[in-house]
Swiss-Prot record:
Binding residues annotated for ATP, in chain numbering: 301-308
CDD domains on file: DEADc_DDX31, SF2_C_DEAD
Name of the molecule in the record: ATP-dependent RNA helicase dbp7
Species this protein is from: Botryotinia fuckeliana (strain B05.10) (Noble rot fungus)
Localization in the cell: Nucleus, Nucleolus
Location of the region described as Disordered in the Swiss-Prot/TrEMBL record: 34-101, 814-845
Main location: nucleus
Keyword Phosphoprotein in record: no
Amino acid sequence: MADDGMLMNFEIGDVPIVAKQAFKGGRWKDRLAAKKTAQHRVTKSTNKPSAREIFSEPQHDTSAEEYIGREASSRAPKRQRVDDNYNSYGGRNENTAAYASGKLPSGSINVGGGRKTTFQEEPRTAFVAGKLPPGSINIGGKKATQIEDEGRAAYASGKLPPGSINSGAKKAISFQDETRPAYVSGKLPHGSIDGMRNREMAAVHREIAEGGRKPGQVVSSLFTFNPTSKKTFDEPEEQAEPAKPSNAPLTEEMATFTNLGLSRRLAAHLSTKLDMKAPTAIQKASVQQLVSDDSDAFIQAETGSGKTLAYLLPIVERILALSENGVQIHRDSGLFAIILSPTRELCKQIAAVLEKVLRCAPWIVGTTVNGGESKQSEKARLRKGVNILVATPGRLADHLDNTEVLNVATVRWLVLDEGDRLMELGFEEEIKGIVEKIGRRSVAKANSDMGSLPKRRVTILCSATMKMNVQRLGEISLKDAVHIQADPSEQEKQDKENGVEAQDKAFSAPTQLKQSYAIVPAKLRLVTLTALLKRAFARKGSVMKAIVFISCADSVDFHFSLFSRTPEASAEVVDEEKVDLPALPKSELVKETIAHGTTISNNSNPVILHKLHGSLAQNIRTATLKAFSESADPCVMICTDVASRGLDLPNVDFVIEYDPPFSAEDHLHRVGRTARAGREGRALIFLMPGVEEEYVSILASGYREGKKALTRHTAEDLIQKGFGGIGREWEERATNFQLEVERWSLDSPKYLEMARRGYQSHIRAYATHVANERHIFNMQELHLGHLAKAFALRDKPGSIKVPGLRPAKMTKADRSVAARKAKRGEKAEDKAPEGERVRKQKKMELDLPTVDGNEAAARMKRKMKEHMAAASEFNIG
């Protein structure tokens, strides 16, 4: 009720009633501008603090640390707006200093020497000239910046996003989502930074303060804001007894080479010279079939089970039987067998095994023809005569078309080794042509003096997997083939008797192989691989040889240079005075592919590094493989999938798949480099958190126990074991290693370009997984910024550009200058090796004929004259 007694349904407060100003007349734009000006004037006058507002400011009680101001709520107090001409605060306790000339209270920042800004946080000690309290950063040597307790960087000038610091340059240093404070110099006091990453963050920010960052670069933390695993897996149960090897030789009671139908001469040679007492299961099944029957065969067996001898022994045995029947066999008696392999390395290895077997019969001659070798030398060997030929499809097709001395009329065996790989590499058309040409030129009649040889040409197809392309290859080459595989295990026999059907598997790994996987975020990939290798070679004899599989050649070059570099003096390095480093091969061929692994070595166990990829010259690849196989010292080979197929590398204990394979079959062949012939072996694959964890199900499909046969690791566990230390000291060591590697790459244009090439090639290779696995290895899920850190890069992904992907061709003058510098002994310019794409382009150019432009023009004129009539020549008519 109002004062005059009138009854109202609303209440009028004490606020004075102000008439609402109306704007009329003129254009609507002018009215709108006048309205905004009036509103701004009213807002400015109402925001001016009064004495009542100042003294009613929320207060903090230092004794109880409880909010006692007006209208207490759970929200944090907001920042108080202060005018430019206002320099004192009221209502604060004794620990809050008032603004005075040149003195700032705790939690305040002097920005530009004029405006004062406070964050109204817990009382802190005021800045003293020349001394900074914990959590402070002196920027530019003049301005002092106080960091909030929440860990946000102060706004020194302009507008900086949270987690950024302006170091006096034009650009801000971003910590990639890091919001914790840093200590620029000195040591961190205990408990000065929230969380458990104080040591690691200190190392990052010391790197910035010491000038290790250039404008536009990003120095990020390793152990923060990494994606976590989204799936939980049961720990594998401990096996009561170790698994029985599935590819081991049989016991002498079960089978001997003599019982398989081999002659005493060959069986004695295998047992005495080659130290082979008994065959494997697949050798037992194959030799018995191929010695006594002339039908085609498909040999399927897991990797490392001895498929090479499974088809070589029957061929050699039947040729030996021919010579024992009174027929004189020599090198010009004819070509009896052709063996096709997909790669040059496998071709060389088959030839090496054949050479060992033929030592018992030196009159039988075998040789090889493959790409990368001199055609003239191969023609000379073929002209002398050969009985068994090991070849790659492309080079054999070339010789069949252009080499007249290659007579395939007497060929009785055609072996297609690694049939799935032959089809994947695109040799289908070459194999079709080879089969047709051999069929047309072969002798149909059976000679009486060759009774022990097959009456018809026998085709043998070998593969560890049964895929659609292998079946298509079988349709091309096989006729009424016999499927040969090892005898089933006792467990499989029992399941079959009980009516349990065998599970369809994408691949079958040896049972004695210990398979594990590691969930590693992209940022931690490099330090995790380093820690894993350090741990593997920590003690002498723990691991003899290891293979690291990487997806592309440029990445192989980068990691080889990284692990073989000379570390900084502050790092843990091998003391050459305390330990004798193993001698490296003196051959000029391998000086760029073999080096000391200083990063992963220690004083008690030095390691030798090897690298191998398809862009290397053939003679270099052969020499590197030979050095790795024959080395008696601990060694690591960093390679692409060129070393994953068929190569029998002795004493390989550990296989690391740093980059996931492009298909499940590639994984089978990779891990098949270890756990061979019944020996134990370990394999570990790197997977990133998220969708890549679905690949664990594919890994488990290769084992009878499924996921129980797999062991799970985390990046933190592997890094802690590799770098060691007390407590969480391993984090600081890993961070120091990462920063050191980044400095190493930034200090040299050569290594920086190698890192960028490796990064870009890795991304291109990541997009080439098979279609049915592309949802697991999805490019959209890849964090390019975190992945760049794994290549020691500080650039943003969008600014990583590789100069010289297609460099200009070297002129004659440039070559002359380089030759003169080399003659004077001057050091050549430090450049990165050519990228993988450039090397492939040069290989294509090598196959093109070199044609002079003037000569081509002259030929064209002569050709035109031949087709011109006399009338047209003299412009008649």
